[in-house]
C-alpha cells in the first residue's frame, strides 16, 4: 500500500483516524496526520489509559512503593472506614484491580456518584466488595480502578501525572504532562467525547489524582514510544525503566 492508497482508505473506511506513527527497528519510519491534527497534538486515548497505569504500577513495584500485587488494597488506606457488614473489601488485592476480577457493589458503573464526589478514590472504595465475595469473575471497570492511581499517589507522595513524567514519560521522550480538572459535569462530558486536538494533559479528580480508567491524552508518536518500550522489555537507551518480568506479566 502506497501513501495515496493509505489516504484513500482512511478517508473512505476510517475517517476517525487523526494520526499514524510507524516504527521499524526502533525508529519512526513514517508518520501522518488527518482531521486538522498536527504531529505534536494529542487526543484522548480513553481506555488505553488503563495500560499506561499498569506500567506505572510495575514501576511502583520496582521502586518499592508497592511490595506486591498480592497486597490487600486496604493496606494503603488504613484510615478508610469499612461499611458495617462488609466482609469482602478486606480481601481485595491490587492484582484483583489489575485483572478486572475485583468485585463491586453495582451492576452499572456509578458515574454520577463517583464523579460528583470530592475524593474519587474513597468513593470508588465505597463501591468495592459486596456480598458475593471474591468470585474471580471478570468485571470490566473504568471507575473502580481509580483506586490504583490513588495507591500510586499515596505511596510515592507524588501526583500520578508527576510520577508518570518522572519515571516513564520524560525518560522515553514523551512531553511533560499536566493535570486537567473539569470544573463542571458538562465540561467533563465534553472532554470524554471530544475529538478535537488536545494538549499534554491527564484528566484528574478534585484531589489531583489522575484517572486510571480513561483521561490520558497522547499523540500517536507517544503511543508508539510506549509500544517500543514494551517490545524492548522495559529497556530504553540501555536503562531498565520497568522490569522485563512485569512486561511479560501484563
Enumerate the language-model features and the residues they cover.
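The feature captures the short pre-catalytic strand/loop hairpin that immediately precedes
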Residues: 32, 122-130, 197-207
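Catalytic-site signature segments of enzymes, centered on catalytic residues
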Residues: 39, 107-185, 209-221
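A penicillin-recognizing enzyme superfamily signal
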Residues: 216, 237-250
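Substrate-binding/catalytic groove segments of enzymes
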Residues: 107-108, 233-239
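Alpha-helical scaffold elements that line and support the substrate/ligand-binding pocket
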Residues: 26, 46-65, 97, 138-169, ...
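Active-site-proximal loop and beta-strand segments within enzyme catalytic domains
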Residues: 4-13, 38-49, 55-140
Amino acid at each position: 500500500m502506497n501513501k495515496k492508497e493509505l489516504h484513500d482508505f482512511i478517508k473512505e473506511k476510517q475517517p476517525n483516524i487523526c494520526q499514524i506513527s510507524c516504527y521499524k527497528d526502533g525508529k519512526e519510519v513514517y508518520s501522518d496526520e488527518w482531521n486538522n491534527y498536527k504531529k505534536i497534538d494529542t487526543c484522548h486515548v480513553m481506555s488505553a489509559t488503563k495500560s499506561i497505569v499498569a506500567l506505572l504500577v510495575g514501576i511502583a513495584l520496582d521502586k518499592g512503593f508497592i511490595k506486591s500485587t498480592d497486597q490487600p488494597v486496604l493496606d494503603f488506606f488504613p484510615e478508610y472506614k469499612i461499611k458495617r457488614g462488609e466482609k469482602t473489601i478486606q480481601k481485595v488485592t491490587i492484582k484483583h484491580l489489575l485483572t478486572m476480577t475485583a468485585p463491586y457493589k453495582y451492576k452499572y458503573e456509578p458515574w454520577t456518584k463517583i464523579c460528583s464526589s470530592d475524593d474519587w478514590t474513597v468513593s470508588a472504595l465505597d463501591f468495592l466488595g459486596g456480598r458475593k465475595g471474591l468470585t474471580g469473575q471478570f468485571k470490566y471497570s473504568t471507575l473502580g480502578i481509580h483506586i490504583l492511581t490513588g495507591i500510586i499517589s499515596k505511596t510515592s507522595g507524588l501526583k500520578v501525572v508527576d510520577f508518570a513524567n518522572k519515571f516513564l514519560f520524560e525518560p522515553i521522550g514523551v512531553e511533560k504532562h499536566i493535570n486537567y480538572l473539569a470544573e463542571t459535569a458538562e465540561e467533563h462530558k465534553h472532554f470524554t467525547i471530544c475529538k478535537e486536538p488536545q494538549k499534554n494533559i491527564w484528566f484528574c479528580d478534585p484531589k489531583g489524582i489522575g484517572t486510571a480508567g480513561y483521561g490520558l491524552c497522547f499523540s500517536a508518536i507517544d503511543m508508539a514510544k510506549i509500544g517500543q518500550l514494551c517490545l524492548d522489555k522495559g529497556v530504553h537507551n540501555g536503562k531498565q525503566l520497568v522490569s522485563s518480568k512485569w512486561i511479560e506479566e501484563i
